[in-house]
Amino acid sequence: QLHPAGTVLPDAVQKQIEAMPDVHRFPFDIAASFDQQGKSANQVADPEQKKAAQQVYQQAMNDRARQAAARTILRALYAPDQLRERLTWFWFNHFNVHQYKANIRVLVGDYEDRAIRANALGKFRNLLSATLHHPVMLRYLDNADNAAGHLNENYAREIMELHTMGVGSGYTQADVEALARILTGVGIDFKSEDPKLKPEQQSQLVREGAFEFNPARHDFGDKSFLGHQIKGRGLVEVDEAFDILCHHPATATHIAKQLATYF
């Protein structure tokens, strides 16, 4: 169970999953097309036609969410590696997102597959990083809006309060603000073209699927985080902060308690 050779579902179940619409399409292509569909619906001038276009858009997103839920249930019922299934459900709730915010429904199935399920039996540090790199988490907790001079603390607070150390574990508001500054520039971009940057910033740009680190939006000042001094130098600050969080005794206590309660 800890080292499954591969999930082999019964033929009938696998065929049912394979028959689902869009199952073989690249997920971020789907998300980009939905983004465009939503924008087009909002630009319709006639009120009745606009309402109809928005209803079609919402229904299409609901269909995607139901498809993802059906796939999850089929795997939970029929997959032979049940430890992976139970841990996938545990981590999916631990790193939870709300699918009815914005258009998260479109990618919630991919979030479960690539960020959670793929790392459910692995190291916590990798799981934390995988959720950060998925656009669903960044959109849900508003980090796509987090930029130098315009801090949004939602994701930073959630990481410390729920994902790692836990409430009342000794961190301060200053630590939350420092982590929010570290996370500036970490966001989403579904466009194929790169953002316009100054020549000296271009080497710092990172794009992986819909994940983007935009150095023009990052706070490059030094930070003091949980007693550690973090030099302002870009995306590597996030790795340093995550290493600090994952090695903190409060994180071990919080995660161990959550797992013990679940099992």
Language-model segments: which ranges?
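N-terminal accessory alpha/beta regions
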Residues: Q1-H94, H98-D110, A115-R117
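Active-site substrate-binding loop specific to GH73 endo-beta-N-acetylglucosaminidase modules
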Residues: K39-M61, A65-T72, I104-F263
